[in-house]
């Protein structure tokens, strides 16, 4: 079997730990029964012997396969990793979702996406990345009593993601340590109102209002202070056609949304200014992970 798992961008400004969306940038995993277990990694992480020895995908896959079948079996697993590590593009969620969905498939169970999502929350407690990795689209999600409740809005082909990917990683754990334990009433109300407004803008396709809707007062600027160039990324993006410019997850990548006809000009402007960073254009994914038989 083969599985494709999309990259994701979470928070989207004010939707801290609640909002996310899916990009057409995929990791793929091919799994087949084998006489002996083997692992091959291509792309991101291919030069890491530690990743092969301490592979989170394998750990989760084997745990769930054993839970479902009561036995261990040998598999040949080939990873094609395209999602950058520790750049705020959901590489960890792709691993978790991919491992769970693959384990159910190889064990002979046709798990619904709801089952996969609720299993994934055990390993990743924030639903804003795992939900779009499962369902695709723009997602608003909450967790209640261990269950994930997620609503999806399909994203239009009229808009594109222009993603700035710095060469400096930022781990979610260290990025969270920057944040305060308490927030003011003003900060909380700002993010509640803007997250609600942002969701309605995507639903109504009012992309012209995304810049207003995506204002955050809780986490972005605090996190961006670890990589000062990100403030300039946002400035250049808005000067060159971006509808919305937000930190992707905990960073260090920056998500810029533009009309498809403006995306190339925006990419060129960002590349010209930030030559050391990758700047890529992606379509939005509305499907989430997909399994096919090889």
UniProtKB/Swiss-Prot annotation:
Keywords, ordered alphabetically: Amino-acid biosynthesis, ATP-binding, Cytoplasm, Kinase, Nucleotide-binding, Threonine biosynthesis, Transferase
Superkingdom of origin: Bacteria
InterPro entries the record matches: GHMP_kinase_C_dom, GHMP_kinase_C_sf, GHMP_kinase_N_dom, GHMP_knse_ATP-bd_CS, Homoserine_kinase, Ribosomal_Su5_D2-typ_SF, Ribsml_uS5_D2-typ_fold_subgr
Metabolic or biological pathway: Amino-acid biosynthesis; L-threonine biosynthesis; L-threonine from L-aspartate: step 4/5
Subcellular location: Cytoplasm
Described function: Catalyzes the ATP-dependent phosphorylation of L-homoserine to L-homoserine phosphate.
Protein name per UniProt: Homoserine kinase
Organism in which the protein naturally occurs: Campylobacter concisus (strain 13826)
Designated gene of the protein: thrB
């Amino acid at each position: 079997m083969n599985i494709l798992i999309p990259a994701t961008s979470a928070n989207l400004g004010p939707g801290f730990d609640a909002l996310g969306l899916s990009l057409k940038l995929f990791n793929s995993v091919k799994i087949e029964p084998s006489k002996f277990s083997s692992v091959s990694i291509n792309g991101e992480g291919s030069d890491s012997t530690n990743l092969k020895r301490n592979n989170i995908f394998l750990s989760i896959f084997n745990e769930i396969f054993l839970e479902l079948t009561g036995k261990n079996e040998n598999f040949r697993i080939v990873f094609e990793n395209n999602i950058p590590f520790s750049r705020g593009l959901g590489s960890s969620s792709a691993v978790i979702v991919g491992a769970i969905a693959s384990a159910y498939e190889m064990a002979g169970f046709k798990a619904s996406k709801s089952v996969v999502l609720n299993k994934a929350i055990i390993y990743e407690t924030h639903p804003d990345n795992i939900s779009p990795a499962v369902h695709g689209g723009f997602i608003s999600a909450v967790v209640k009593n261990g269950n994930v409740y997620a609503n999806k809005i399909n994203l239009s082909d009229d808009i594109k993601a222009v993603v700035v990917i710095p060469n400096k990683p930022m781990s979610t754990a260290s990025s969270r340590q920057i944040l305060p334990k308490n927030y003011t009433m003003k900060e909380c109300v700002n993010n509640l109102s803007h997250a609600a407004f942002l969701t309605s803008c995507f639903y109504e396709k009012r992309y012209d209002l995304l810049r207003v809707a995506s204002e955050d007062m809780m986490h972005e600027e605090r996190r961006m202070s670890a990589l000062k160039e990100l403030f300039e990324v946002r400035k250049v993006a808005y000067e060159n056609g971006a509808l919305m410019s937000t930190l992707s997850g905990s960073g260090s990548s920056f998500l810029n949304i533009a009309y498809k006809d403006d995306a190339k000009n925006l990419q060129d402007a960002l590349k010209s200014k930030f030559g050391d960073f990758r700047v890529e254009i992606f379509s939005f994914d509305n499907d989430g992970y997909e399994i096919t038989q090889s």
